[in-house]
Amino acid sequence: MKVLVIFAVLSLVIFSNCSAETDEDFFGEESFEADDIIPFIAKEQVRSDCTLRNHDCTDDRHSCCRSKMFKDVCTCFYPSQRSETARAKKELCTCQQPKHLKYIEKGLQKAKDYATG
């Protein structure tokens, strides 16, 4: 019985791969044009109304700026219990770069500097 189930799943996978659209069908001239996507990419890169790093993004959490490679993330936290704003339990959010992305960016920059010079 197990062999029959495995054979059925395998044949279904093979059939679906054979009948799927090929890359030529998907990237044909009529279905995909690079001119359609370029304005969206340009708009994201030139976004001037973004929130700078370590600035408040509480009201608009998707407004953080980009660094050289990655977009900063709006990180939220509650202030310490000693401060007056903590008594109001107000959440504060700032645009920050996650540490792993910071290390990746620095490592790639050092590799690029090493390769070029």
Curated annotation (Swiss-Prot):
Example GO biological process: killing of cells of another organism
Disulfide pairings: 50-65, 57-74, 64-95, 76-93
GO cellular component: extracellular region; membrane; other organism cell membrane
An annotated Gene Ontology molecular function: toxin activity
Any Pfam family the entry gives: Toxin_35
Residues passing through the membrane, by range: none
Positions of post-translational Threonine amide modification: 116
Function (record text): Synergistic toxin that induces or increases a cytolytic effect when combined with CSTX-1 (AC P81694) or CSTX-9 (AC P58604). When alone, has a weak insecticidal activity, with an unknown molecular target.
Domain notes: The presence of a 'disulfide through disulfide knot' structurally defines this protein as a knottin.
Subunit structure: Heterodimer of A and B chains; disulfide-linked. Interacts with CSTX-1 (AC P81694) (Kd=430 nM), and with CSTX-9 (AC P58604) (Kd=370 nM).
Name under which the protein is recorded: Neurotoxic enhancer CSTX-13
Source species of the chain: Cupiennius salei
